[in-house]
Amino acid sequence: MCVCQTMEVGQYGKNASRAGDRGVLLEPFIHQVGGHSSMMRYDDHTVCKPLISREQRFYESLPPEMKEFTPEYKGVVSVCFEGDSDGYINLVAYPYVESETVEQDDTPEREQPRRKHSRRSLHRSGSGSDHKEEKASLSFETSESSQETKSPKVELHSHSDVPFQMLDSNSGLSSEKISYNPWSLRCHKQQLSRMRSESKDRKLYKFLLLENVVHHFKYPCVLDLKMGTRQHGDDASAEKAARQMRKCEQSTSASLGVRVCGMQVYQLDTGHYLCRNKYYGRGLSIEGFRNALYQYLHNGLDLRRDLFEPILSKLRGLKAVLERQASYRFYSSSLLVIYDGKECRSELRLKHVDMGLPEVPPLCGPSTSPSNTSLEAGPSSPPKVDVRMIDFAHSTFKGFRDDPTVHDGPDRGYVFGLENLISIMEQMRDENQ
């Protein structure tokens, strides 16, 4: 289906999916909760997304103090369609070679990377992490209708062990329980349709390799927040700028500098992920935003009060870093807040509920595990949380790519959003002590 040079991709981990001896079969990243570009799983520790030159350059130019708050940039791969023996078309990644003719998402920007990337970034690595639920394969059937630009038929060959359930606009549960975040599937279908409609000449596509920031979490609860009071880049057309400004004015982006773009939260009482998408987030009032944040921190049994300080500490640290980044603008960037939905304390709490016991033990320490028969917890330890900035396709700073517009001072719209997010979380913490 496409012509690629025969190259050795490298050592495959035990969780790798191979496409012949040369390529890596890309799988859907089932924990994608927002965005419009499809994220694909490359291996346990790595995801990939369609390359946009500005975003690639931005990752290569990140200030060192921002790297704690962004996914690690791992390089570039070439991606193309390939057919299998069952008549399905899959996305397969190959090592990127600079001499290849490759397509990327930002049509006006076709320049090649300024440097070659180490082969380390092209090796498919495995791990011993508990991510069996992420092993899914996305493909679509070839048929007479496959030349149409409508959404392809998608078949997921394996699924998450934890069902996902979308919340409707009335805050009620949908009847459908599926094995992947519904927004993830939507993005995959749209991405495949775009690529298929552009693939008449069997072109290769460039994809960025990035750290999978949820790979540390067994049951990742993810909140995707669109940050800032402005979303359009300096190079946006007047029409697009007006459209983005309307979205901001009609949402909490204008009033708070932040709006919900997507969410999944694990519910201990049902064993499901509850999901929200960007359309829900756009319609929220300030009070609605507060309620959404409360819902994100609630596991179906309790408000996770133990999460307040770890998350607030991360947010304050990020705010301090961004206040020092003069001329930087992160238009249309998102912020991911992540925690584990089934840590030791949570499982002990569920045991107490099942046994009718009133007290919840303190946080678990190294000496305690959910499998212990005793319900006594060891020394307390803070829960694992993470905060990461993503999506830099419209970011800029002084001297970046000779951008004609240069801004003064830090990104005040982004910082404004962080200040309000911190304030709302502090109020919620104080009200629920």
UniProtKB/Swiss-Prot annotation:
> Which residues lie in coiled coils?
none
Q: Which stretches does UniProt call biased (Basic and acidic residues)?
A: 150-160
Q: What is its main location?
A: cytoplasm
Q: For bias kind Basic residues, which ranges apply? A: 113-123
Q: Which domain of life is it from?
A: Eukaryota
Q: Spans of biased composition, class Polar residues?
A: 139-149, 366-375
Report if keyword S-adenosyl-L-methionine is assigned.
no
Q: Which GO terms describe its molecular function?
A: ATP binding; inositol hexakisphosphate 5-kinase activity; inositol hexakisphosphate kinase activity
- Mind naming one GO cellular-component term on file for this protein? cytoplasm
Enumerate the residues binding substrate: P220, C221, V222, L223, D224, L225, K226, M227, G228
Localization per Swiss-Prot or TrEMBL: Cytoplasm; Nucleus
Q: Does the keyword Transmembrane helix apply?
A: no
| Phosphoserine: residues carrying this PTM | S151
Q: Which InterPro entries does the entry mention?
A: IPK, IPK_sf
Q: Which cysteines are joined by disulfide bonds?
A: none
The record's listing under Gene3D superfamilies reads:
Inositol polyphosphate kinase (3.30.470.160)
Could you say which EC number(s) this protein's record lists?
2.7.4.21
UniProt KW keywords: ATP-binding, Cytoplasm, Kinase, Nucleotide-binding, Nucleus, Phosphoprotein, Transferase
Q: Where is this region: Disordered?
A: 100-160, 362-383
Pfam families (UniProt xref): IPK
**Catalysed reaction, written as an equation:** 1D-myo-inositol hexakisphosphate + ATP = 5-diphospho-1D-myo-inositol 1,2,3,4,6-pentakisphosphate + ADP; 1-diphospho-1D-myo-inositol 2,3,4,5,6-pentakisphosphate + ATP + H(+) = 1,5-bis(diphospho)-1D-myo-inositol 2,3,4,6-tetrakisphosphate + ADP
Per the record, the GO terms for biological process are:
inositol phosphate biosynthetic process; negative regulation of cold-induced thermogenesis; phosphatidylinositol phosphate biosynthetic process
Q: What does this protein do?
A: Converts inositol hexakisphosphate (InsP6) to diphosphoinositol pentakisphosphate (InsP7/PP-InsP5). Converts 1,3,4,5,6-pentakisphosphate (InsP5) to PP-InsP4.
Which family does the entry's similarity section mention? Answer: Belongs to the inositol phosphokinase (IPK) family.
Instruction: From the Swiss-Prot or TrEMBL record, give the protein name.
Output: Inositol hexakisphosphate kinase 1
User: What is the scientific name of the source organism?
Assistant: Rattus norvegicus (Rat)
Write the gene name: Ip6k1
